[in-house]
């Protein structure tokens, strides 16, 4: 569930994720 859910928002939320820190969290991994 978390994999597909992140894949969808990650593509369109890439900019928002970087601002919120979602992409940063993935990079930290």
Curated annotation (Swiss-Prot):
Residues 1-29 are annotated as: Disordered. Residues 20-29 have a biased composition (Basic residues). GO terms for cellular component: nucleosome; nucleus. It is found in: Nucleus; Chromosome. The modification N6-acetyllysine is found at residues 6, 11. The nucleosome is a histone octamer containing two molecules each of H2A, H2B, H3 and H4 assembled in one H3-H4 heterotetramer and two H2A-H2B heterodimers. The octamer wraps approximately 147 bp of DNA. Core component of nucleosome. Nucleosomes wrap and compact DNA into chromatin, limiting DNA accessibility to the cellular machineries which require DNA as a template. Histones thereby play a central role in transcription regulation, DNA repair, DNA replication and chromosomal stability. DNA accessibility is regulated via a complex set of post-translational modifications of histones, also called histone code, and nucleosome remodeling. This is Histone H2B.
């Amino acid at each position: 569930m978390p994999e597909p859910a992140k894949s969808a928002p990650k593509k369109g939320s890439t900019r928002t994720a970087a601002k919120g820190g979602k992409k940063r969290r993935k990079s930290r991994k």
